[in-house]
């Protein structure tokens, strides 16, 4: 509804900030009513709501004024491309700066290595100041605008962004919205007794409300950090600490917190970040009597952030790191009239987990059962697809998906956990259980891609056949991530077949967290082996290089909501069709350790059966048979048929 008073306020703001950009005014005009309605829905009852809303509008204008001409030009180029992040051209890598290269200053020297592989989108793991020994890998932030000394400076980051931009590469960094370190300036001011800053966090005089809340709040780290509240002696209060005791949860019922954190989002946008990764968005709103995850207000806050960035910094996309149940993940793309106006990206954690499930069992039915949820993703948003990342693997797919495949959920998950943690006799995988809950026996999994695929144990045994099988598994897993829809994100070290790194056990700041086993320190002498034929590193690297090249050559794999999963004709073979109009490719993946066959009837899906197809991966030409004829796939083989 047109609101003359609000439009007048907008024009006064634009005038006072001396903004003459017609496109900015157009975007602001289109969004201001929704910005106000979302703000009022959350904060309308706050005694200073009107003044704080004015502060919010000012911060949007100021962010645009602060945006460089270069970035505004890049915004316009992205707008011209349309939804640039849906393209098949994007292939990413996630990395820790120190463990990959040393410092930010050293990263430009590593770009040729990444470009040779085909990577053009970098996710730099947390960069900002966090206390040594209490950093949670950089997710306990002490200062959102100061780069960790050992990594470099903001100037180094700006220079690196410029280097990426010159190479037409993209940058993603994290913002931790849910919490800060207890050494953050706001936490220090709260500890000093300043009430205004105590209201930036959740603090309680006694255990009454914490006890109530803990009845319904799941524990995140039950082993290393049980409970969701920590007693602070200096304050003589209980502080909400959902993750670790040194991470204080921010109180978003306080609009000042929202405006401050939005300012940090804008700061990152104006560094030239192409995608901001919002860590743990599911947790940002808390309410007694709930799990304090995935609440409606959390979505309203994310939508409000998206609207504000669409106005001031429109070239920056948002990734919501919501590792939640399959049905709930869809909500992070926005619902109803806000579909595709919340997060542009979400991690396809369900697809990642069901791929690991299929690899352990040789049975793809659970993967197939998950697809009707995943196919609900709206056109215009996309997945970030991956096989491994810095985090653990959670088996978060729904029980009914397991039951429909004929398995018992508890027993099935126990099998998967045992298979990958080395407790299952005969399993080649080498990983470990993470965050075991002694009450429920729930647990997640740590381990590198290569070690979970059996490479570590095969090398230990010097078993050449097992080494080759593990490489085949690695490439199978990566191939599915390349073609299943979304932007594939590799994890550093995986491109060279790095196995688990156990050096974390000797570091008191890391030894309690076995996820560090799959966060290697790159040995660049070893990485020279990616160019030496016959090495494991070379086999993995060159296969990935070829996969990326193939992906990039196929506009049909851009994420245009153009995927159709094949009906089950073999419990070990997952298959889907990617299509644009009459054009299609059929992708088949054998998750079994044995050769498998599938009927040529699959070629009828999405159009008339061709007489001949070419496997774009192997280069093989194949004559298409009748329904009673079968196409063969070797163990862990995949085919991309056109």
Show which residues each predicted segment covers:
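Active-site and adjacent substrate-binding regions of carbohydrate-active enzymes
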Residues: 1-642
């Amino acid at each position: 509804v047109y609101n003359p008073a609000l439009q007048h306020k907008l024009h006064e703001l634009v005038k006072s900030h001396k903004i003459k950009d017609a496109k900015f005014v157009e975007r602001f005009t289109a969004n201001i009513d929704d910005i106000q309605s979302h703000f009022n829905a959350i904060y309308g009852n706050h005694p200073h709501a009107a003044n704080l809303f004015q502060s919010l509008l000012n911060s949007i204008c100021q962010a645009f004024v602060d945006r460089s001409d270069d970035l505004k030009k890049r915004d316009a180029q992205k707008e011209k491309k349309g939804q640039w992040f849906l393209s098949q051209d994007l292939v990413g890598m996630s990395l820790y700066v120190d463990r990959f290269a040393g410092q930010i200053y050293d990263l430009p020297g590593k770009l040729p290595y990444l470009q040779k592989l085909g990577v053009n989108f970098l996710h730099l793991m947390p960069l900002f100041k966090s206390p040594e020994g209490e950093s949670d890998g950089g997710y306990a932030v002490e200062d959102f605008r100061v780069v960790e000394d050992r990594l470099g400076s903001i100037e180094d980051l700006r220079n690196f962004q410029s280097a990426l931009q010159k190479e037409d590469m993209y940058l993603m960094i994290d913002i931790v919205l849910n919490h800060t370190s207890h050494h953050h300036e706001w936490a220090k001011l709260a500890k000093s007794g300043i009430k205004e800053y105590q209201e930036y966090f959740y603090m309680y005089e006694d255990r009454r409300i914490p006890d109530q809340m803990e009845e319904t709040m799941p524990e995140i780290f039950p082993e290393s950090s049980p409970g969701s509240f920590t007693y602070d002696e200096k304050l003589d209060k209980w502080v909400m600490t959902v993750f670790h005791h040194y991470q204080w949860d921010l109180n978003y019922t306080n609009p000042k917190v929202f405006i401050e954190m939005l300012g940090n989002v804008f700061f990152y946008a104006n560094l030239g970040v192409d995608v901001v990764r919002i860590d743990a968005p599911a947790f940002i709103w808390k309410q007694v009597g709930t799990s304090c995850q995935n609440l409606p207000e959390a979505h309203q806050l994310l939508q409000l952030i998206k609207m504000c960035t669409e106005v001031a910094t429109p070239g920056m996309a948002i990734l919501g790191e919501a590792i939640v149940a399959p049905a709930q993940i869809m909500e992070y793309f926005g619902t109803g009239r806000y579909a595709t106006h919340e997060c542009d990206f979400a991690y396809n954690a369900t697809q990642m987990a069901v791929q690991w499930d299929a690899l352990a069992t040789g049975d793809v039915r659970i993967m197939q059962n998950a697809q009707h949820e995943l196919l609900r993703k709206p056109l215009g948003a996309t997945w970030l697809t991956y096989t491994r990342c810095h985090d653990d693997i959670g088996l978060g797919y729904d029980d009914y998906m397991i039951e429909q495949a004929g398995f018992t959920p508890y027993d099935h998950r126990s099998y998967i956990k045992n298979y990958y943690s080395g407790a299952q006799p005969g399993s080649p995988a080498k990983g470990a259980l993470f965050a075991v809950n002694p009450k429920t026996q729930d647990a997640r999994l740590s381990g590198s891609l290569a070690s979970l695929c059996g490479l570590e144990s095969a090398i230990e045994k010097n078993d050449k056949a097992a080494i080759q099988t593990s490489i085949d598994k690695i490439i199978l897993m990566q191939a599915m991530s390349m073609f299943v829809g979304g932007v594939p994100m590799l994890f550093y070290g995986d491109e060279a077949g790095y196995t688990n790194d156990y050096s974390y056990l000797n570091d008191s700041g890391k030894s309690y967290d076995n996820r560090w086993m799959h966060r290697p320190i790159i040995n660049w002498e070893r990485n020279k082996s990616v160019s030496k034929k016959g090495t494991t590193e070379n086999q993995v690297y060159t296969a990935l290089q070829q996969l990326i090249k193939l992906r990039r050559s196929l506009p049909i794999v851009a994420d245009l909501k153009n995927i159709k999963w094949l009906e089950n004709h073999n419990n070990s073979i997952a298959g889907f069709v990617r299509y644009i109009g009459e054009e299609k490719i059929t992708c088949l993946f054998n998750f079994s350790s044995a050769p498998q066959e599938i009927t040529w009837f699959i070629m009828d899906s999405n159009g008339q059966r061709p007489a001949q197809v070419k496997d774009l991966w192997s280069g093989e030409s194949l004559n298409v048979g009748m329904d009673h004829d079968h196409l063969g796939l070797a163990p862990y083989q995949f085919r991309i048929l056109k």
